[in-house]
Amino acid sequence: MVITHNMKNKKLLLGIAWAWLTCMSANAEVKLPAFFSDGMVMQQQTRVNLWGTATPDAPVKITTSWDKQTYKTTADAKGAWKLALSTPSAGGPYTITFDDGKLTEIRDILMGELWLCSGQSNMEMPMKGFKNQPVENSNTDVMNSRNPQLRLFTVKRTSSFTPKTDVVGTWQEAVPATVREFSATAYYFGRMIQQQLNIPVGLIVASWGGSACEAWMHPDWLKAFPEAKIPQSEADIKSKNRTPTVLYNGMLHPLIGLAMRGVIWYQGEDNYNRASTYADMFSALIRGWREEWQQGEFPFYYCQIAPYDYGIITEPGKNVINSAYLREQQAMVEHRVGNSGMAVLLDAGMKTGIHPGKKKVAGERLARLALVKTYGMKGVTAESPYYTGMEVKNDTVIVSFDRAPMWINCKDRFESYNFQVAGKDRVFYPAKAWIQRSKMLVKSERVPHPVAVRYGFENYVEGDLFGEDLPVSSFRSDDW
């Protein structure tokens, strides 16, 4: 009887121990943010951060297939862990295995170039377009989009009062079904980068239509802008995509620290009615993102908003605000902020639509900036000429430009129809404008003594002044 009793106790103890071990094993599993997952692209030839959660205080072993090395770290009391390791040159596929008592594996990892793509609706606009707002030639481009070397990740729209630690999204290979739903601007950017470099490219899109610049910023960066009302509680969030800080918290914060090459940005339409602070605010956003990432002065390329008749969305009885002031503010930023560049879209707007269909133009101009300024491509022009000054000789204004080594051109003619001049009365009149190498000569019979000149400084304009094939931004010499 005693022997039987002891055997029963031993069996009971063994059963309890097995159940405990099984329970611990079930809980002992590394959890990773959504962007650390199968099919991801990791930035090549750099130090990358990996992070996640595991069993509190447990050791975590990370094994990488490209160097067959095992790295060790330890989760803290809350289960959080972080580790930095080196990545090889472009290639793959590779795997990473995580072990804290239970194995977790990321498969089909490619090493290549990783870019973050952010902004509002013109960045968000998918290849399939919006209702009654198609993307030009998208059907053919979608049909031909299959490319296992191009990987896509879209962050789900998330607005939050407090900073989040993860996003919702999955990595997808570029095939017609996935490309159709993906950002058109980002796709055309990534496609050109991948084709020209012939290495894997990953694109992470974090965008929300109608979002304000302030929504993508940390509250500390907005202290210089008292008009930006930072929410003090959930009740203060009156708009999920415009309230300051809410998209930084919900969509950007979880990505901070992810090793990448740089950022492309297409935003500004929501800020057109408060343009006077945009250059300062956008510059603060770029500096803030760079400081948060702690990856140096990474490239930041952005689109200037395209021309559109904002009178269409102006309430009856209210003055129509000229969005050229916002374009002017955007143009200031590339001269203030290092390692940045602006894709001018003055020839790619749509009078009756705020979402122009020329997304290939936008994406590929951003890609040219990256190819030349980041990847060192020679023989290609990536930056538009820009206005540097004017002088008056008799009744003619002589306008000068920089970044115009091949002179200014108007494509199929030698004159521009978008210039105006004004005298001391500050009244602008249409002017005749013709090319003289890298300068423009401008005059109007109605202004015998000009003191100011403007080009394309209207809500909607069809840009007709170029340096090679890149349009000159709208500009003005005055500050009236």
Question: Which sequence ranges carry the predicted segments?
Answer:
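Cell-envelope and extracellular/periplasmic
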Residues: 29-480
